Amino acid sequence: RLPGSLVQPNDKNTAIKAALEAGAQGLIFPMIESREQLDQAISWATYPGHDDGRRDGEPLRENRGVGFCRANAFGRDFDAYMRDTAPRIFLVAQIEHIRAVEDLDAILSQPRLDAIMVGPYDLSGSMGLTGQFDHPDFKAVMARIHEACRRHHARMGLHVVQPDPGELRRQVAAGCRFIAYGIDSVFLWQAAARPAGV
C-alpha cells in the first residue's frame, strides 16, 4: 500500500518542509537527474540522524527543521512521530530525463530511496522521441531501467498516461510495483468522445 504522497519541487526546501509538516507520509521528487540532486532532496526531507544514505566520511547533512506542526499534532505526538513516522516517509525519485538513466546505478544505490517512478513523456522527450513509446531506442532505455531496478532490488513505478488495460498488465508483468494510471483530463475527454447511447 502506497502512503499518501505529494509531488514536490526537488529544489525547494520550503515546499518539502511544508508538505511534511502538513502530514504527508510520502514525497515524489520530480526530474531527479543525478545522485547529487537526490541526496539534496532527501536531506531536506529527513531529520538529522534519519538519513542512512551518507557515503563514508561524510558529515551529517540532513536539513529538515524540527518543530511542532500538524504532522506531530503540534507537539502532542512529537516523540512518536520522530520515532515511528519520520524515518519511514516514503521517498520516490521521478526518472524523467536520459541523464537520470545515465546515473541510475548511483541513484538506486541511495539507501534512503524507496522507489523510482518513470515519467515516459518527459523521458522520451529528452531523447528526441516525445511520445514514441514503441521506438526501439525508447524500449531499450525502459528495459535498461527495469534491469537496473532488478539488480538493485528497487521498486519501480510508471505513469501509464493513456488508460490501456493491456499496457497496464504488461507493465505489472514487467515488474512495476506502482502505477499512476491515466489522467483525469484523459478519462474525461475519452468518456465525452463515446456515443451517449441514447
Report residues per predicted region:
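Expand to "…catalyze enediolate/carbanion chemistry for C-C bond making/breaking, isomerization
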Residues: 1-198
